């Protein structure tokens, strides 16, 4: 009986601490910095919402909102993240044209993953004019050290 009372008390304490911790994310320094316009903090807040970490609830719409705010300030990682969100349909429907748009923004800022993902979108579109552009993005991603891009480029050239 003592064991069950102790276990019950422990579970209730843990539940209370988790609730209290998650309710206070709006008061933390990072959130306040994000609200004041700090682009790095905006990206971090978005990642916390995306993954449900650091006391933030998992909320794709809030993640998308904060990534969009950081993206408008030119943050390539936020733009890449928006590409992922729209490509996978996190928090809504998949939107390939928006994914391509955000990947292109980040790719133009030399973001290696965005360059790879943009190339893959172009390759999957099956349009012949896109093959040349896709190869160019794969080459750029390869120069950025993206191994998957190097492999894909080799695969295309061997066809």
Tell where the protein language model's regions lie, with residue ranges:
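N-terminal leader/linker segments that initiate helical-solenoid repeat arrays
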Residues: 18-50
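Terminal, low-structured helical/coil segments at or just beyond the last alpha-helical repeat
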Residues: 137-159
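Hydrophobic face of amphipathic alpha-helices that form TPR/SEL1-like repeat modules
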Residues: 44-51, 81-88, 92, 117-124, ...
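Bacterial N-terminal signal peptides
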Residues: 8-17
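TPR alpha-solenoid repeat register
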Residues: 41, 78, 114-116, 149
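Short helix-capping/linker turns of helical repeat alpha-solenoids
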Residues: 36-38, 52-53, 72-75, 88-90, ...
């Amino acid at each position: 009986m003592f064991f069950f009372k102790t276990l019950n008390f422990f579970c209730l304490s843990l539940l209370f601490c988790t609730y209290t911790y998650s309710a206070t994310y709006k008061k933390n320094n990072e959130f306040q910095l994000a609200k004041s316009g700090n682009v790095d903090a905006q990206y971090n807040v978005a990642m916390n919402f995306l993954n449900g970490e650091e006391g933030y609830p998992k909320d794709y719409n809030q993640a998308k909102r904060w990534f969009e705010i950081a993206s408008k300030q030119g943050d390539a990682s936020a733009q890449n993240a928006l590409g992922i969100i729209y490509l996978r349909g996190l928090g809504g429907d998949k939107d390939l044209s928006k994914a391509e748009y955000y990947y292109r923004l980040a790719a133009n800022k030399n973001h290696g993953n965005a360059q790879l993902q943009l190339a893959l979108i172009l390759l999957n579109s099956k349009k012949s004019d896109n093959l040349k552009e896709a190869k160019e993005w794969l080459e750029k991603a390869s120069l950025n050290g993206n191994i998957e891009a190097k492999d894909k480029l080799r695969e295309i050239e061997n066809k």
